[in-house]
Swiss-Prot record:
Protein family per UniProt: Belongs to the influenza viruses PA-X family.
Keywords assigned by UniProt, alphabetized: Decay of host mRNAs by virus, Eukaryotic host gene expression shutoff by virus, Host cytoplasm, Host gene expression shutoff by virus, Host mRNA suppression by virus, Host nucleus, Host-virus interaction
Upper classification of the organism: Viruses, Riboviria, Orthornavirae, Negarnaviricota, Polyploviricotina
Functional note: Plays a major role in the shutoff of the host protein expression by cleaving mRNAs probably via an endonuclease activity. This host shutoff allows the virus to escape from the host antiviral response. Hijacks host RNA splicing machinery to selectively target host RNAs containing introns for destruction. This may explain the preferential degradation of RNAs that have undergone co- or post-transcriptional processing.
GO molecular function terms attached to this record: RNA binding
Active site: 80, 108
InterPro entries in the cross-refs: PA/PA-X, PA/PA-X_sf
Site (Important for efficient shutoff activity): 202-203, 206
Annotated site residue numbers, Important for efficient shutoff activity and nuclear localization: 195, 198-199
Protein name: Protein PA-X
Length: 252
């Protein structure tokens, strides 16, 4: 599973996942399924933000990666992937600037258009079950919840899906692709079932083979994130900024 993750996800996402697991004292060599789950969740958060900006009129617009409008404001602030101290600093700054109510738990994103925090969920189970678990944990109507599954299902607060259908289709296609690639390597069952994962761990099974280089497209506009095992597209300037911000070691 570890080899699969390193082949299938953007190196920055892998690095962020490693950092997150280290922060919580988890060993990715042992908790390989959690490593894969964290990388998947991070990628969905980044894809959620991809292409979405706010223009000078305060309207939400979708900008293609080749579009020269680099000075537009990103619609979503990405909170997930930062160390806890920095993440809470970002949340506090958003609350002070926008007047938003401070959440009890760290959310994944902030939507500047709708002025709300968003909790993203990616589940291997039934979406409604995971949604209820998230809602019971958060216990706040101020935080918007959006759940995706590997089967293409989704569920969101008050059926408000925030993004346009095409943007959500990119995310669903990517998740379905990850599932198919795991299944082709005999990893999917262990990813879904902890019992099966323990069996594979005891047997010392490792994923084999190189990732395929085929391309799956979702509608007209397709993020390179959907290239099955190639790094997801991100604006180069934003990538540099995020890397400096997310991976910066906190001062002791």
């Amino acid at each position: 599973m570890e080899d699969f993750v390193r082949q299938c996800f953007n190196p920055m996402i892998v690095e962020l996942a490693e950092k997150a697991m280290k922060e919580y004292g988890e060993d990715l060599k042992i908790e390989t399924n959690k490593f894969a789950a964290i990388c998947t969740h991070l990628e969905v958060c980044f894809m959620y933000s991809d292409f979405h900006f706010i223009n000078e009129q305060g309207e939400s617009i979708i900008v293609e990666p080749e579009d020269p409008n680099a000075l537009l404001k990103h619609r979503f602030e990405i909170i997930e992937g930062r160390d806890r101290t920095m993440a809470w600093t970002v949340v506090n700054s958003i609350c002070n600037t926008t007047g938003a109510e401070k959440p009890k738990f760290l959310p994944d994103l902030y939507d500047y258009k709708e002025n709300r925090f968003i909790e993203i969920g990616v589940t291997r189970r039934e979406v409604h079950i995971y949604y209820l678990e998230k809602a019971n944990k958060i216990k706040s109507e101020k935080t918007h919840i959006h759940i995706f599954s590997f089967t293409g299902e989704e569920m969101a607060t008050k059926a408000d899906y925030t993004l346009d259908e095409e943007s959500r289709a990119r995310i669903k296609t990517r998740l379905f692709t990850i599932r198919q690639e795991m299944a082709s390597r005999g990893l999917w069952d262990s990813f879904v079932s902890p019992k099966e994962a323990k069996k594979q761990l005891k047997k010392g099974l490792k994923s084999q083979g190189q990732c395929a280089g085929s391309l799956i497209k979702a509608f007209r506009r397709t993020s390179p994130a959907l290239r099955i095992l190639e790094p997801m597209w991100m604006d180069s300037n934003r990538t540099a900024t995020l890397r400096a911000s997310f991976l910066k070691c906190p001062k002791k």
